[in-house]
UniProtKB/Swiss-Prot annotation:
Name this polypeptide is given: Ethylene-overproduction protein 1
TPR repeats: 443-476, 539-572, 573-605, 698-731, 772-805, 807-837, 868-901, 903-934
CDD domains: BTB_POZ_ETO1-like
Keyword flag rRNA processing: no
One Pfam match: TPR_8
Disruption phenotype: Compact rosette with smaller leaves, reduced petiole lengths and shorter inflorescences.
Subunit details: Interacts with the C-terminal domain of ACS4, ACS5 and ACS9. Interacts with CUL3A. Putative component of a ubiquitin ligase complex containing CUL3.
Annotated keywords: Coiled coil, Ethylene signaling pathway, Repeat, TPR repeat, Ubl conjugation pathway
One of the GO BP terms on file: negative regulation of ethylene-activated signaling pathway
Amino acid sequence: MRSLKLAEGCKGTQVYALNPSAPTPPPPPGNSSTGGGGGGGSGGGTGGVGDKLLQHLSDHLRVNSVRSKSSRTYPPPTQPNAVVSPEFLLPCGLPVTDLLEPQIDPCLKFVDLVEKMAQVYRRIENCSQFEKSGAYLEQCAIFRGISDPKLFRRSLRSSRQHAVDVHAKVVLASWLRFERREDELIGTTSMDCCGRNLECPKATLVSGYDPESVYDPCVCSGASRSEMMNEDECSTSQEVDYDMSFCIGDEEVRCVRYKIASLSRPFKAMLYGGFREMKRATINFTQNGISVEGMRAAEIFSRTNRLDNFPPNVVLELLKLANRFCCDELKSACDSHLAHLVNSLDEAMLLIEYGLEEAAYLLVAACLQVFLRELPSSMHNPNVIKIFCSAEGRERLASLGHASFTLYFFLSQIAMEDDMKSNTTVMLLERLVECAVDSWEKQLAYHQLGVVMLERKEYKDAQRWFNAAVEAGHLYSLVGVARTKFKRDHRYSAYKIINSLISDHKATGWMHQERSLYCSGKEKLLDLDTATEFDPTLTFPYKFRAVALVEENQFGAAIAELNKILGFKASPDCLEMRAWISIGMEDYEGALKDIRALLTLEPNFMMFNWKIHGDHMVELLRPLAQQWSQADCWMQLYDRWSSVDDIGSLAVVHHMLANDPGKSLLRFRQSLLLLRLNCQKAAMRSLRLARNHSKSEHERLVYEGWILYDTGHREEALAKAEESISIQRSFEAFFLKAYALADSTLDPDSSNYVIQLLQEALKCPSDGLRKGQALNNLGSVYVDCEKLDLAADCYTNALTIKHTRAHQGLARVYHLKNQRKAAYDEMTKLIEKAQNNASAYEKRSEYCDREMAQSDLCLATQLDPLRTYPYRYRAAVLMDDHKESEAIDELSRAISFKPDLQLLHLRAAFYDSMGEGASAIKDCEAALCIDPGHADTLELYHKAREPNDQK
């Protein structure tokens, strides 16, 4: 670990496994067990418990076949030591291959992702400043497809930064807020401001293009309207020379003729244009739909241009008057004034009708802003649904410039997350289609509507929308066309579609995965193996192979197959499958561990073909597993910590939270583990729960700081840490401050300050899990400062409290002291202790000769194909051996499923050295799409473009 900002220096706890090597799975159960309960000599007593479990499960399936929330509790089985046959826990039986099929990704997916990323980069660079927001939105759609939340949020921020009109600012700022799910934070309101113009609900209502100011502090906490008044109310002042009156009913409103005339051309024509009213001192205004209070307000505005002291109902009257008599300045003032009054859902529901009727652009924008900042709860309000979902509602919004692709892109994503099959989702996607103009917009809208229709089993409509997406240029939608044909018993037709796709284009993992559905036997397995070779992150091939092994009664091999992907990707569906098979093997401890882990990732997960809630399976399995007290759980957590078993650690924390759900410290640890597993969405949910359950203000501030830091708000996170320290000195506050400060290139003074902060953290009370991490990070800073002996002391102290990752830091110290053998041995110790040890093999490769390094890196890739260093090393070795094409192939293999910045940069450099300028430029552009400020890539890009620029 070179610095705190590297992956190995993650702030998260490294929580480790009880047994570094998993035990050999027991053989599959035989068929000799009786129907009463277990396969043993327990007799009738066991059968009675089995009957209770069966009845319990059957009742659950009958009454609660579909459940959407996890908040219910279930009565556990009464006997804790029962021996129960798997049949009672699996009334649906074991999984079968015939029921397995991969989901179609609802996001944009490309045959040549690198080319698409390069195109988007060129579009962003070459378009006008007023088109940049839309270009960044397309980039958002691409990054959504590669499941990188940080890249997605960065593009979304850029889209908001370059937004010009109020509507786009409102939608994009609300979307940014939703991505942090601040609606889940107790004690906050939808209109709370984060302190920057980027998301400030008042700043979004200011039109104009000013990208440089979006990160400035906002002025929403400045002076109120009343404080801005610099003159007294003067509507009845004797200094005013009234020269006419408007008569409304029995009352008169005295006015200044030329002031009223200045409100609009119609008023000027009426009062000075030869009409009979020109000669009258009193004009009857009774039939013009305005009250005496309204007319008095109009008179005051005509002299002061202010609306500050008028109640909303009077301002609404003025808005109507302004529309009737074309008073543009008055209308603009009323629109702005009313817009700044909208702060709640009830106010927004009331005022949006006035806004739409009176064509008040800002007022409607303000109401929309409340609806959007109240998401997802506002999506369940029938009045909000009517405005957003109906064709009439969209037309009304469009008449004011408030129906956009951006709006419906945002809304449809939320609806699909909430319920893919709902009518609301369908209607929002239909509105999205109506708003789609650009090619990529049509591709996305058509494809997503096809996916939803497929989920609803409306196959003809699904096929129609998938075909439309293909015609718009989205080749991945051919997967949807083939699937809908397959569902309608046109299997051969489906096969031909995907076979042609593979023949006509460079094959990808998802192509072979899809074709496997439409063939059988060895051909199916060959396609699945090819899919894994092209893209090892696809979960379906592992699941299918595992279930095929189960069908052959090879349970241990099935578990081993799933372990391959779960070693580097915490996939809920693979955890479910492993738990399912474990129950069949009567490994209830293993099943319970996996179910607890997947419920941490997805709390509302429905298991076994959406039949049983995961929480219910926990209740059924819990009596069959070893019972732990909270103290036992802490010991288990330490054991898993020391053997780098993150999934096992998640299961232990889930168990502990079941006993103490309000423990914010446990929620925080859970979030850190999830970040280590690259499950950011679940991690942020745990962080929010930690913040909500915090018992003190200083603790709450720390969790708020981590939320801000993890969503890209480093300065705000530092401020939270400092505020927490000012209230009470604590380990976590000092650690947060040190971590946030270290997330940059440190000069000597900054490094010394980070060292002081970590030393202060270590003086504060905490447990060994966190102190080990602090010692590890402190050692990293000492290494960067070339204080190797102090670093070695830190790593040694960390190892004494079972912070196993410290072996890696100590190995680096040995390496810097030219003790290469000691460094190698230190990494070997980590490999022996760690259950997840791909990174350890990768790091050990730095401390041995080329042949041994190659061996270690091959193992690292086998264990975790997402690690990019092994590909880069092997490619560099091939280039040194003048095997250019093999080096390019090595990098391309990884880029095809992980378009990584470093991989793209290295391949671009190789292309440049080979004289293939066009390929080098394309890879540079794709890399700059990921990080537009990457200095080395920018330098290479300009160099590769020089021949073209000279031409």
